[in-house]
Structure formats: C-alpha cells, structure tokens
Amino acid sequence: MSSSREAVAACRRQMEAQLDKLRALNASEAPAEAVAPELAALQSLSTQLSELSVSKKNKGKITLKTPKGTRDWEPLAMALRKHVFATIERVFTTHGAVTIDTPVFELKEILAGKYGEDSKLIYDLQDQGGELCSLRYDLTVPFARFVAMNPTEYGNIKRYHIAKVYRRDQPAMTKGRFREFYQCDFDIAGSYDAMVPDAECLCVLVETLDALDIGSFTVKVNHRKILDAIFAVCGVPEDKIRTISSAVDKLDKSPWADVKHEMVEEKGLEESVADQIGTYVQQRGGRELIAKLQGDAVLTQNERAVEGLAEMELLYQYLDVYGVTDRLSFDLSLARGLDYYTGVIYEAVTALSAPPSMTAASSDNNDGSEKTKKKNVAAENGELDESTVGVGSIAAGGRYDHLVGMFSGSKRPDAVPCVGVSIGVERVFSILMQRIQEMQARGERSSVRQKEVEVFVLSMGCLLYTSDAADER
C-alpha cells in the first residue's frame, strides 16, 4: 500500500513539473511543434496516474466522488446559500445596480496576461473548432470585455453579477476555497468625480457584510500608486515591480522574514532594497498614516505617491459621510496580486481569515497522532492540509481604469474607468455554516429553514353565544 502511494505521489510530481514546462513554453510563445511532444508527455503521465490510482480490486468500478475542489450541496446548505445570495442581491439593487450574464468560458486571449502570477490557475479547454478557450477566472475581465464591446450603451453603468468562476487552486473545502465557486460582483463603470464611486463600492462592501451578519471584520485599504511609488523610491527595477508586489501581498499569511527571503532568494532583489521596502510595508493605521507619509521627504519626491496620498485623503472624507471609516485600516502591505488594478485596492478580513499560528501547526506535526498521519497522506497526494490555512479575505476589489481600454484599443487606455468589489460568498458561507453547526450542537434552532412555510392569518369575529343566538342558528 505504501509503495503504491509513493508511486502516485511521484507521478503527481512529474505531472506538476511537466505542467510548469508547458506553461513556460506558452509564456515564451513557443511554436506548436515544440509544444506538441510536451503535451503528449503530459497526457501519458495523466493516463499513468489514472492506472496507478485504481487498484486491481476496484478496476472497472466507477469511483463515486465529485472532482477535486468541488462538492454537492445538501438542502440545509442550499437554504443558507439562497439566503446569502438574496441578501447580497438586495444590497446591490438598493444601490441602483442592474445585472448581466456572460459566457462561462472566454477566448483564451481575453484572459491572458490579466492576472499576473495567478494566470497559472486558469483552466484551459481543448481546442474546439479553431478557438482556444478558457474557463473564466473571475467576473471582472468578462465585464470589461462586455463594456468594450458595448461602449455606447454600457460605457456608464452600475452592474452586478452573481455567477460561478473556476481556478486551478489548491482547495480547502471547509475554508470556502474551491476550484468551482460563486463570485458576487458589484462594479461601477464610467467617469465620475474623483473617489465617489470608490467610496460607494466600499460602502456596498460594508453594508453587504453587515446585512449578512458576518460578525466583526476589518476592511484593509491601500493604493497601487502609493505601493508602486514605494517600490520605485526603494530601488526596485521596473520589470520586478509586479513580482515583488505579489510577494508583499503574502504578508497577511507569512511573517516578514519569509517574504523578505522570497524577494531576495527567489526574486533576485538586493537585500538592502528589501529592507527599505520592509520599513514601509509593515506600516498600517488610519488617516494619521496618510499624514505621516505626506511628511516623508523621500516618498513625496515621487509624483505617483503624491497623487495616491491625495486620493486616499479624499476617499476618507467621503467615507466619513458614509460612516464607515471605523471599519477601515490603511495597510501598506495590501497589494492584490492581479495586474489590472490601477488605484485604490481593498479587502475585508475577519479573525478567521488568518491561518493558524505556526506554533500550533508545529505542535500538531510532532504529536504522532492520527491527525498528523492524515496530514502526511494529504501531502503525499498533493493536497492542501486545511488545518494550516485560514478562510482568507471575505471580500475584495479596487479600481481598474485601463482594463476596458486594453480590449477596445482606444487611444486613451482610461477611456472607461472602472471600480468594483467582489464578495467571497463561499468563504462567507463557510463562516455562517460553521455558526449554524455550532448552534445545532448546542441544541439551538437556526433561523435558516430547509422548507418554505406559508402562514395564513384569519381574523374571526368574537361571537357571544347566548340562547337567542343559538336559536337564530
């Protein structure tokens, strides 16, 4: 049994290496004759893995399971999901948004180059009739493509979209991390006064999470102009800014020492430059941090930093009117890995968002328990151990002024500026479902019901029965 498991794990590793080789070929736009043999090798490994995964005893039998990263939803879960979707949609429509729908798969060239390092998570489909297609990774890029195709009619629109997206991620099911999952997006496209739509999107985010009764949460806010300016004044080469930004974005999951190691050892950044970056990106606070950065003589020599700080100051003024500034944290470590963001960026987190402490994980790994053995089996099978990850952000978004222009070919890349927010509905659902299960364990009843109940109220007059009344009857 052990040797069979080792063979499966080895085959999985070979497949990952082969996939990396194919991604590198695609990234370098290698000719088809160079890609074909590598693709054939991957298919051969896939067949080999299938044969190894089926024991002689079970050969010919169908394994009843859902694909990795997907699941079925039982009646109670569906009742809760229906409530969550209805609540989110109610908030979106209250702000005047209309809904659209787009194909579940797009032309591969539409999605290519929009997600930075996350592009490797896109599901590519086999060639069908000469068109190379991929499953949509999010709802933002399809929306930008939609606006670019209909600029006259929909160049100025508040839109929401609730639909499934697909990512080749390492799933952690109980943490709301799937390969097939719903996103609930609210976006504003068009030209408005500075920071007005940005403030409304943040207000929508807060109102939605409050309406879902998610509990305590914090909205981390940053600005790509400020972040890029920090990298510039610290001496990061232009061609490394996006990869260094992706490393910084991991500070919510990893300590600074690990992030610095990645920047220096893996990304090739000079250690002195990484240290300078660390003095900035480990800062967080409120409006007072804006004033502090405006007083930084080195940073304010960069024009983009001055613009970004002025926009952040204006954003806080609008959010004061909405009454949500107490939920915000100006966090310079927030980077958002997607390449299309150009301005304000934000994400909402809860106490469950962060992964368990390294200390707890270490003690679990050394206790020799059955739980530890299961973790080791999961590692051998290339699976993610759910006990080592948090829920992650429960909502995120930002400004992406150039995305529509990338599709429309306009001479002005920011001809249709956009800003939006996406609610991580699966992660919200996992938190709410855990709450229901805890209530059931205590013998309490949840307000979420699997069956609809219709209540009829009938008003009946009060008749005082007397002997005369009885005779009349």
Where in the sequence are the language-model features?
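Alpha-helix boundary/N-cap detector
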Residues: 3-6, 10-13, 33-36, 40, ...
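Retroelement reverse transcriptase polymerase core
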Residues: 210, 215-216, 229, 235-239
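TRNA-binding/sensing appendages of the translation machinery
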Residues: 49-141, 149-150, 179, 199-200, ...
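Positively charged, Gly/Ser-enriched RNA/tRNA-binding surfaces
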Residues: 80-95, 106-109, 140-214, 225, ...
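Auxiliary tRNA-acceptor-end handling modules of aminoacyl-tRNA synthetases
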Residues: 2, 6, 10-80, 126
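Acidic, His- and aromatic-enriched active-site or binding-groove loops in soluble protein domains
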Residues: 121-128, 236-257
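Glycine- and charge-enriched loop/helix tracts that form the active or gating conduit
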Residues: 218-228
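Short low-complexity, flexible loop/linker segments enriched in glycine and/or proline
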Residues: 114-118, 233-235, 344-346
